[in-house]
Design a protein with these regions (language model features):
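Conserved nucleotide-sugar phosphate-binding/catalytic loop shared by glycosyltransferases and other
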Residues: 2-14, 28-81, 312
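A short, glycine/small-residue-rich beta-strand->loop->alpha-helix junction that serves as a flexible
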Residues: 9-21, 204-206
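Short N-terminal targeting/anchoring amphipathic segment
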Residues: 80-97, 439-443
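A donor-sugar binding/catalytic signature common to diverse glycosyltransferases
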Residues: 93, 251-297
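A nucleotide-sugar donor-handling region in carbohydrate enzymes
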Residues: 119, 124-125, 134-201
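Donor-nucleotide binding loops and adjacent catalytic segments primarily
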Residues: 177-263
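C-terminal "capping" alpha-helix adjacent to the active site of nucleotide-linked donor transferases
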Residues: 305-310, 314-331
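C-terminal amphipathic helix plus adjacent low-complexity
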Residues: 327-406, 461, 471
């Protein structure tokens, strides 16, 4: 029997959580199906090298290469074209909110089974009001387990439509490198103590948290500090105090080399918690309170039950003090030993099994046209007054052009996007980060698929408007 194709789509969320979960599911699917990962996250560049799985990068709406309305249609058409090209039976979406384009793809192709992998521990954000409508459009809703689920009091906690699995993680004891192997892979000294720092930079308070955390490492003899991104602000100014031996290292998946580290400092995202703690890395969590993820709830659970230390993200002195506690070998030993009690992270295999069952089932759920229309209306409302204002400004511009015919509007073709089937991180990273519009194709794409993709790109990017005044 031919292996079914399953598309695993992810949003461009904060951190690598969505992409890491999709990767764990894809690895579990490889023996029985043909998984394809599509994502708006730049980290997708690492997937082909690591997993040998076909993937496609989709530029997100945050690139601002087209209007929001055009991007919704663009995403729908990209997903439909990929499903037709690969004869995919299932489209799984891992993200906080299923984009209108994702749901529109299901509405346009009812035979395509749609699954929402919906992480729990939501903060009480406005997105909660459309949970029921979005869930009703799905063939299945799956909630990847969270070790801190007992502290989940958000809007998804009491809903009944989701199937709960064990936690999902790319960390697997049987695949992880030994301490020596991991340190050699990262180019580290084999004997010096080593700390991993996974904190973001950007806004002022985020930068201050990075500095506060690194300050807690001062005085740790012979320490080497590994960061996943350079500790600099937007102007290139260092956020690190003097006196630390710092190194920036990129390795995917980081889960394979976690045994290299004596301790970790990390945001309390799903991915960080479910990799560092199963790997028994003594960790201080500094929560990122932006976004939908209730990182503070997860951090409190980890701290209250002795699996990690929680730093008060609003108190820089507390961040420094909690990190300094990691210098005590007894503290590190206690945290590491406690983490051995955590449950197995087998959720990736559980989700893979459910997706495979759907892919081999005869028919999917027929979604309600009324539900879809209600969801469209709600989406318009949720975009709020800004959307209404923009529509009004467009109308005023049309009136102004009618009243002032001396202003001519000329439309010219924009430079065509770059199409390619690149499949290595070295090739993909520069293209994804570039200001040039990049249209990524799965390896082995057919001529008809490329033609369809060119049509989709032209419709989305269209023409550039140039206004010239003439007397």
């Amino acid at each position: 029997m031919e292996k079914p194709t399953i598309i695993l789509a992810t949003s461009n969320g904060v951190g690598m959580g969505h992409l890491a979960r999709a990767s764990a599911v894809a690895l579990a699917l490889k023996e029985v199906a043909n998984p394809i990962i599509v994502s708006m996250a730049g980290g997708i560049a690492e997937i082909p090298d690591f997993m040998g799985i076909r993937c496609e990068y989709i530029p997100g709406k945050d690139r601002m290469w087209m209007s929001r309305e055009k991007w919704d249609v663009y995403l729908r058409d990209r997903l439909l074209a990929l499903a037709e090209e690969t004869n995919a039976k299932v489209l799984s979406f891992d993200g906080v909110i299923p984009y209108p384009g994702v749901i529109a793809a299901k509405n346009a192709n009812p035979d395509l089974k749609l699954v929402w992998v919906r992480r729990g521990l939501w903060q009480k954000k406005p997105q909660r009001f459309v949970l029921g409508l979005q869930s009703a459009m799905m063939d299945k809703v799956i909630e990847p387990g969270d070790i801190a689920r007992a502290y989940d009091f958000g809007p998804t906690a009491t809903r009944k439509e989701a199937v709960l699995t064990a936690p999902v993680s790319l960390f697997r004891k049987e695949d992880a490198m030994t301490r020596e192997e991991a340190r050699k892979a990262l180019g580290l000294d084999l004997n010096r103590p080593t700390v991993l720092v996974q904190l973001g930079t950007g806004e002022g308070d985020v930068n201050e948290k990075m500095t506060a955390a690194l300050s807690g490492l001062l005085g740790w003899k012979d320490l080497q500090v590994i960061l996943t991104k350079a500790p600099v602000d937007k102007d290139g100014k260092s956020l690190a105090p003097e006196g630390l031996d710092l190194k920036v290292a990129r390795y995917f998946p980081l889960a394979k080399v976690l045994h290299a580290f004596d301790a970790g400092i990390c945001a309390t995202g799903y991915n960080g918690v479910h990799e560092l703690l199963p790997a028994q890395v003594p960790t201080v969590f500094v929560s990122n309170i932006r976004g939908t993820d209730d990182q503070e709830a997860r951090a409190r659970w980890c701290n209250d039950f002795g699996f990690a230390l929680r730093a008060d993200q609003a108190d820089l002195a507390d961040i420094t003090a909690k990190v300094k506690m990691l210098q005590d070998p007894a503290v590190r030993q206690r945290l590491s030993a406690k983490c051995a009690e955590l449950p197995d992270t087998t959720g990736g295999q559980e989700i893979a099994n459910m997706l495979y069952q759907l892919a081999t089932a005869p028919k999917g759920k027929k979604s309600s046209g009324l539900t879809y229309k209600r969801l469209l209306v709600q989406d318009r409302i949720s975009r709020g007054s800004r959307h209404v204002i923009m529509l009004g400004l467009r109308r005023l511009a049309l009136v102004y052009r009618f009243l002032h015919p001396h202003i001519k509007v000329q439309e010219i073709d924009q430079a065509p996007p770059v199409f390619g089937e690149q499949a290595t991180a070295a090739e993909l990273h520069p293209l994804i980060k570039s200001s040039t519009r990049f249209e990524h194709l799965i390896s082995g794409a057919s001529a008809s698929y490329r033609k369809r993709r060119e049509e989709i790109a032209f419709a989305a990017y269209g023409k550039e408007t140039v206004i010239t005044k003439t007397k």
